[in-house]
A protein has these predicted regions:
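Active-site loop segments of alpha/beta catalytic cores
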Residues: 1-177
Length: 177
């Protein structure tokens, strides 16, 4: 588990067993606390410090719940060896798909509120997943779907497994089985 969600499998990080260094590991930075701060202010006041941390790691993951589309160009320039990028509900998912192409893992943070009710709107869940997946397929994105931050399932634990079923169906519909 790395960053704000996801699995960090990679063949790009190599270390000597028993002598692992930061350069052999994933780094993670985010700025969700600055979601209402302008991209220019993030560039000036936050990214220089995040760059200093990120340069110590072999690969980097960036983002959590902040909308990334408005600050993407600055993040891309500041964070070395960036491989994974969080695309939250507060980002323009289409723009992020175009920006990331096949160069980064598109870590799509699905809204946990979709399954936080007793009876989820399955058609809405399906439609939203399909919109994102279709866009990502067109742009050649490497997509990861992340359902997290579930503090309640509307007293219906089946919501989680049903969401997985729907997600698998939509992935198969867009990408084939």
């Amino acid at each position: 588990y790395i960053g704000s969600g996801g699995i960090g499998y990679t063949s790009q990080l190599h270390g000597t067993p028993g002598q692992v260094k930061l350069m052999d590991m994933w780094g993670f930075n985010e700025a969700q606390e600055t979601s209402e701060v302008s991209p220019e202010m993030v560039k000036e006041f936050l990214l220089p410090y995040q760059h200093e941390l990120a340069e110590k790691f072999g690969l980097n993951y960036y983002g959590c719940c902040e909308g990334m589309d408005g600050r993407w160009e600055y993040v891309k320039e500041a964070i070395p060896r960036l491989r994974r990028v969080s695309v939250s509900q507060w980002a323009d998912s289409r723009k992020m798909s175009e920006y990331l192409k096949g160069d980064y893992v598109y870590c799509y943070k699905v809204s946990p509120t979709d399954i936080a009710v007793p009876h989820p709107d399955e058609e809405y869940i399906r439609r939203r997943l399909n919109e994102v997946l279709e866009c990502c397929a067109r742009n050649g994105n490497k997509v990861e779907l992340l359902m997290k931050d579930n503090h309640t399932l509307g007293h219906n634990p089946r919501n989680a497994s049903r969401w997985v079923e729907i997600a698998r169906e939509e992935v198969a519909r867009v990408y084939g089985s």
